[in-house]
């Protein structure tokens, strides 16, 4: 199993109105990158609001293993970085646990160095394909040893001098884009990434913030060209990590579905590459008020007031998928209570997440009485306003497949369903949102 912890099932039951004001743990994407860029930069980086889930902590441990000094004082993480180009060879394999982001980005960061680095992970991460990151690294001259199908364990050895490349990202993947850019940091000359569909852009924004010479151009067709000059100096920064929109999704959708709810969520990252879920829910009729919008560390941030809403089904534009890929499971839960059908297309990326998320969602919905159809890369959900008949009175358990987002999504389903909803394991929620149970029960949710 993922953590060597024995599975701990959890059950969510129909709840009365959810009320309160909450702060969500820091954004996972920005937290991973804060540890990485702080560990690489010259001088001191100070981070508040860091997401202290296992995934991010594993990225921090990897940076420590390559020479960064990391300590915590009160609520602040303080990093003394090694300086760009000065990472040290790790003495042991770098263990990323369940973290696809940390693993793939670090492969880019250190793979081009002229020493061996070995990457390992848990049972779930070991099944996930790494080839999409390894292919461009091979073009830069990196030698790759990997398990069958370019899976972990992977050992990388960079060339004496890496080649700068121009790489067109073949799928909408911020991880692949970021891995190539990070490899470019220790490569002489200009590394260019061409991105046909825009994905989350935290790597570009944060590298510019740390002083990298990086430019972004967008043509009339929306194709982005990112150029990075290698071997420049990065300088330590002060970072306050905004709340993770992917974690915000759970209390937000719960408040929309439980009658009488009125919940305010503070300090949420509103980067336009991450707000597809909020936009979609608003199209479905969700009452989501964006309050106090502001800029923090180059990123858009706001507070959200969310109230119970009667939703109606919509067709989600396929091009929106990259900006909400992690939120489809909880969107499918919202759709289960909407009037009419919600159609979601372009979901092929969901099949290679922590689990095959598409089939995991469809199976869980069916187990709990939701009418849905799973296609090759699509999901259609026909909702039942009020949740009558939804849930599983017999206590049938949703198979989470060690996937934190599946577990949290189905616990939200149970809060508004007529019958309880049980998930087979809730231990792995700690990878991204350790405070989930306490935060939800604090708002009035019944989860046990």
From Swiss-Prot:
Gene (UniProt): aroA
Annotated metabolic or biological route of this protein: Metabolic intermediate biosynthesis; chorismate biosynthesis; chorismate from D-erythrose 4-phosphate and phosphoenolpyruvate: step 6/7
Superkingdom in the source lineage: Bacteria
NCBIfam families documented for this protein: aroA
UniProt binding sites for phosphoenolpyruvate: 28, 100, 128, 175, 357, 405
Class of enzymatic activity (EC top level): transferase
GO term, biological process aspect, one: chorismate biosynthetic process
Listed name of the protein: 3-phosphoshikimate 1-carboxyvinyltransferase
Active site per UniProt: 326 (proton acceptor)
Gene Ontology CC, one term: cytoplasm
Main localization category: cytoplasm
Keywords noted in UniProt: Amino-acid biosynthesis, Aromatic amino acid biosynthesis, Cytoplasm, Transferase
Presence of the UniProt keyword Disulfide bond in the record: no
